Curated annotation (Swiss-Prot):
Keyword Transmembrane in annotation: no
Biased composition regions of type Polar residues, renumbered to the chain: 673-688, 705-715
GO molecular function: CCR4-NOT complex binding; RNA binding; RNA nuclease activity
Protein name as annotated: Meiosis regulator and mRNA stability factor 1
Region (Disordered): 617-639, 657-720, 1671-1718
Modified residue annotations for Phosphoserine: 65, 757, 1088, 1090, 1568
Role, per record: Essential regulator of oogenesis required for female meiotic progression to repress transposable elements and preventing their mobilization, which is essential for the germline integrity. Probably acts via some RNA metabolic process, equivalent to the piRNA system in males, which mediates the repression of transposable elements during meiosis by forming complexes composed of RNAs and governs the methylation and subsequent repression of transposons. Also required to protect from DNA double-strand breaks.
Organism the protein comes from: Rattus norvegicus (Rat)
Domain NYN span(s) in chain numbering: 351-488
Main location (coarse class): other
UniProt-listed InterPro entries: LOTUS-like, Marf1, MARF1_LOTUS, MARF1_RRM1, MARF1_RRM2, Nucleotide-bd_a/b_plait_sf, NYN, OST-HTH/LOTUS_dom
Occurrences of domain HTH OST-type (ranges): 872-946, 1000-1076, 1096-1170, 1172-1248, 1256-1331, 1332-1407, 1408-1482, 1483-1557
Encoding gene, per UniProt annotation: Marf1
Skewed-composition ranges (Low complexity): 1681-1700
Amino acid sequence: MEGNGTENPCSRTLGWLHQNNDAKPWLWKFSGCFSLPEQTLPLSSQTKEYMENKKAAVELKDIPSPLHVGSKFFPAVPLPDIHSLQQPKVQLSAIPKVSCCAHCPNEPSTSPMPFGGGSGSSGRSGSLIHTGSLLDSPSTGTVTCQVGSDFAFQSVSSLQNASARNNLVGLASDLPSMCVDSNLPSCKHLSCCGKFHFQSCRSNVHKLHQFQTLQGCTSAGYFPCSDFPSEAPGHLEEHLSHSELTPHLCTNSLHLNVAPPVCLKGSLYCEDCLNKPARNSIIDAAKIWPNIPPPSTQPAPRAVPLCNRCGTKGMEKETSLLATSLGKAASKFGSPEVAVTGQVLETLPPIGVFWDIENCSVPSGRSATTVVQRIREKFFRGHREAEFICVCDISKENKEVIQELNNCQVTVAHINATAKNAADDKLRQSLRRFANTHTAPATVVLVSTDVNFALELSDLRHRHGFHIILVHKNQASEALLHHANQLIRFEEFISDLPPRLPLKIPCHTLLYVYNLPANKDGKSISNRLRRLSDNCGGKVLSITGCSAILRFINQDSAERAQKRMENEDVFGNRIIVSFTPKHRECFEAKSSNAVVDKAKSPKKVKNTKLCLIKDTGEQSPSAKAMPGKGLQANSGSATKNTNFKGLQELCRMEPKSGNRIRDHQQGHGSLATLPNSGPTASVPTLKNTGVRETLHRSSQKKENLSSQSIASSPAQKKKREGTVFQISYPSAFSQLIASRQVSPLFSSQSWSPRSMSPNLLNTASPLAFNIANPSSAADCSDPFANGVDIQVSNVDYRLSRKELQQLLQEAFSKHGQVKSVELSPHTDYQLKAIVQMRNLHDAICAVNSLHRYKIGSKKILVSLSTGAANKSLSLLSTETMSILQDAPACCLPLFKFIDIYEKKYGHKLNVSDLYKLTDMIAIREQGNGRLVCLLPSNQARQSPLGSSQSHDGSSTNCSPVLFEELEYHESVCKQHCSNKDFSELVFDPDSYKVPFVVLSLKVFAPQVHSLLQTHEGTVPLLSFPDCYAAEFGDLEITQDRDKGVPLEHFITCIPGVNIATAQNGVKVVKWIHNKPPPPNTDPWLLRSKSPVRNPQLIQFSREVIDLLKNQPSCILPISNFIPLYHHHFGKQCRVSDYGYSKLIELLEAVPHVLQILGMGSKRLLTLTHRAQVKRFTQDLLKLLKSQASKQVIVSDFSQAYHWCFSKDWDVTEYGVCDLIDIISEIPDTTICLSQQDDDMVICIRKRERTQDEIERTKQFSKDVVDLLRHQPHFRMPFNKFIPSYHHHFGRQCKLAYYGFTKLLELLEAIPEILQVLECGEEKILTLTEVERFKALAAQFVKLLRSQKGNCLMMTDLFTEYAKTFGYTFRLQDYDVSSVSALTQKLCHVVKVADMESGKQIQLITRKSLRPLTVQLLVVLMSWEGDAYLPVDELKRHYETTHSTPLNPCEYGFMTLTELLKSLPSLVEVFMNDKAEECVKLTSLYLFAKNVRSLLHTYHYQQIFLHEFAMAYTKYVGETLQPKTYGYSSVEELLGAIPQVVWIKGHGHKRIVVLKNDMKNRLSSFDLSPVNHEDQPAVSRQILEVPEPHLASELHLRTGPSQMEQELLQLANSSPVDLLCAPVPSCLPSPQLRPDPVILQPTDLIQFEEHPQEPLGVLFLNQEEKTEIPIPVKKGNLSCNSSPSSPASASAPPKPSSEAPGLLISKDAVESPAKKQPKNRVKLAANFSFAPVTKL
């Protein structure tokens, strides 16, 4: 059959009842099944996918006669009236024949069984075969058979004889794998319909979707609905849920009272079959069959029906089956065909579906099959499907979606996604073809929202007269919607889609290659085989001798490879390829290699399965075993309404099935295979029951789990080898169940999981393990039998509990039945819910659909709970063992065990589960209660973590109650107790008083360890003072409780020592680990660790600390706890809210913060030493931070403490008697201790932060402002900062990034932004007052801008504020009492105007900040003084220069500093040493300052861009590096200062032009500092540009007697010759040019009035001061004393209006590339100075 069709990927060959003559006794091939290979039934070429052929109707003339095929298939079977079977192929109008009728004989001895031989769509009923003849049929070849039987049982009436029924049942059990596919790929029918549809598979029967059959036709592989023997129906019912028992029809005419048959589509039915009701219930026909009007066509003439078996003629009267009589029989896939009297009605109007799946896509993880089904069910009523096409790029679309569409017979057209509108063009083409092919009336369904289809829809509707149905999304265009007759929203159409299940799970298949050359090396052969099998995905596993094993990903690939490789040449040898090994050694090698491969790649094993063939050993001729195989999990798109069944359901089903199997085997000597009971896995055949023998053998041979066999019981010694299966689970939930259900499979055999071999516990894959004994599996309970718990977190706590429960109930009820909804109490804003659903399938659907579903204002997080209800016994045994191993004598009272268990693991314990652990624990009755004891075989500790040798923790250390190792302990020490007559019966616990001591912990600690050493590690607390007195003298016990520390608490302050409670209630002082701690152990490792608790207990522990720290000495009587709690917190302490019934239980639940002292009713409550140390550390850090020097001397500690906390210092408040005792407990990473003048100094340990960390902290301060501005009232709890920061910015707040180790330290590093307020234990973060007003101003601007006219009535302020920002406005947050006072503080933002209707708040009109920015830049760039300028000085210079006051409020800022801080890219604001606010230019604008000065030396203040770099280098004295400023080129750098320059032009003609606003030159006298001596040095500090040292100075002296002539005087202060010295930058160039005649307007009157005034000043000095005797009378004479260094180069002042032509511009002296106007400073030859550039 391999050439006739393809098989299912999970199929495999089956062994048959007769073996080949040349086969080994242990090997079974698939030979002998049929007579001749050429007589096999021809297969379709497309049997892999049952829906690949879209044609709904098939000509019967193309199909061979069913009886003819049956006769060819089984020639040895004698048939009556054989002449009636030899007839030509039937035509469409011919009457098909009924299989048999009541007139046919039924002999009990040779009960014939109707065997489906073909497709029911052609009206065939199958052939009749006898059991004996079938078994005796010879075979000559190997035939691959497919799973899914087409056989049918006879009716009960014809099987009255018991033997006949037994024979039939045995044959039915032995032949589960016989199936012959027909040539019709669309649907395959049997003569008699039934309930189970079996997919083609090789060894296992997989239940697929129960297809709703056509009228009178049933899908292939269905059992008869009513004709099961007495045992078979019940056997099959065990594996079906009630929902899967759908109504069905039967076509069998084997009833005794034969009525006229009724024909539908070529099949004949008797009245009994039609009138018989369904097995379970009658379904309303109106709900089953679509309401399609009956066609008006006339049925074709019919002949008299004739029985296919005996030739008896029936009646001529025929009855047509209509919708009202048969019920719904529409196909799930493909077009609903309405067939009456064998003819397909072609008169129905056509319908075409055109789906733009890229526009209206299938939701992620949802089933495309359901979408197609809904389209067909909604629109195809009364129509015939003519077209169903979707267009997409299949390489971009989900492969599973494409596969589902192919399975649904949808045409998937591929287009290139990169081409523009390719999908739309293809769909428009399909629409036009549809219009050309079909005529009205016709219907077009377009699934798209694209407006491009509007033209086509309009044409189809108005020109062709088609009915247009548009399935669109919400955002569809009106132009598109206008052209449709019917509109349907796509969102509603795809609502509640079920999740898409995986189509198939790949299974690895092995292929064996023989006849390989022996003289070649393995690598060459491997390469050759790999080349032959590469196209099929083969992998060479091993090469042994002349054979090799190849692995393929599925069966199809292996079959293709077999065809390609068969008889191929491999180095001169013709190889033979087979699915079965030839020798036993080959099989063993294959199994070992498979195990190795799985061990190497466990991840691959999780997703795939290896189909292994297991050796069956020698067996008797009467009992032949078929090769075993791993379970095949198959869940495809056709699966619907199936329940997820885990391993436990399979285990529960196995005992009944196994017993029936064994009965059939013993009665008939055949092997039975069970039909699958679930969509995910099959039930394997289990014949062996010896679990202990299996485990014993596995421990001896160390066999791997996947290849070991299970021994049989003594009654079945001859059937020694069985089948061991691997079970693979399709989902992670099932894997979770499986991993926890291994142990219960063996619990009933009294087998301890501790004795399991390591190979069993640590296999390569957690999914593979043995199912040992079916009978033992009967005790396994379904973990989800009582419902499935779903945990819902991130629930909106602002909603009421009732509203939340209702919303959750409504949301989850859409996905299945909800059993209960439970909410956790409101505590610490951590509200969670537990929703219990009916089954696992509904729970999985709910988790997939509702995860991150928004309820209220939050998106809930949904996950499947794995709580106590789903815990397996194996996990319970581990937890029980860990508790009992740490208990005294490995025993605990039952009530104490339950208490510890529930507190340790956080969930309830079912006591009945403990009785199931009979192999591990024993529960004994003792006295008035029960005792839980660990069996001796399990008392050894599992790991050193729980052993007495461990010093890093103990399980008892984390449990609320600590027990002594003995069940009973003496109340007092008999040796040292002063009261020799002490008796427990007489002792009254209420009379005990807790002693208070005054001791040093350094002295007391070694004494206690010594005392425990002499008392063998335990000292009763009652006699501790007596024992201590006997060893070291009397204790210093004080009667004043306010001056001492409780002895019981003081003992627990010693590292490694604790006080435990024995089971008789006696408190005992003991070592934590029952031995002295090592000398070098960290004390913190010896403290009790915080147990993992729920949020309620964490909140309660904080409240306990806050309550007790306000009590004297942190001690509180237990009787006063409730009233003080109520008084302190203003609420009741409800113990039930925390899950407890008694207060003492609640107090014991927080042992890491609360210690209970004493006994009886006079017990005292205090904080543990660990909590006290933590509390003292916080107080100490607060005290140190309050000091200016961040340190304090121990002698001044009391005074500093009083100043900081406003109360006297008392060391007993922290549970110790000496300060040094508790300081020594603080880690060195927190504080630093140093010695200073015989006194100890305590200081905070800090490290210097880098400059990068400081810059990051500045950025962090901006983030904090942004975060808190989004919080109500600009404040938030401290503990919410980190999650809020992460949520707001989408990144983690890493403290090390800013140079801190604690968040509080980081927040305290920005005191100008943030304040940390403490309200008891809770810390609140809020903005400072300045930042609050800034934030409020921004809110007011937003609020007023949203109002009409940018104004708001004052009376409406609070209402509009709450409406806009979601919380009320509080005046007290801003320290004001009225809105008017508030507006005065916000005068830079709002103003109050008196209107007729009242006072109105108006938004002021701000001035533009851009002109002011330019003006401030000019002032700063013209400043010739220090590198920075005080803010006040800047304001004064601005007002002096522009003669206008500078009011920041006009620009929307309260102060000038805030205004400058809003320009971070231009200036920097900082505090100098004098605590003055100063401002300076940024490094980028210092560069801009130099550019401005450079351009001022050029004519028209512009320069070519390509000359700029060289000119700048000459001018400044250093090379221009744009990368220094963070830019890659000069052009980008200049573009970063748009306020100063701009670039115009193109190409090489681009020029750099100074902005007009920057051309103004301010007076140097106004901006220069008074002291000019230090200016050059300071100027060099600004830009740090080294200036060349000039050895000579050139002075221009002008005096009263020298006014008419100019004298150049050279003053040489260096011995070096002037010519050898560097040329000064201001020295005139030797190039001489005549002055151009330039007429300039001059004031001649002013010129004649002062003829002898100096007209210019020339500076030739760079470093030393210049002598400038200038009489300043009228006007401002430029005194540019700054050198032309890059740091201080500034523009000369603007010429005075009185004498514009008298002043020398700097251009005339320093311009390097332009002709100068006529200079007022003349030399002898009347030549002007040439351009001079700086060196």
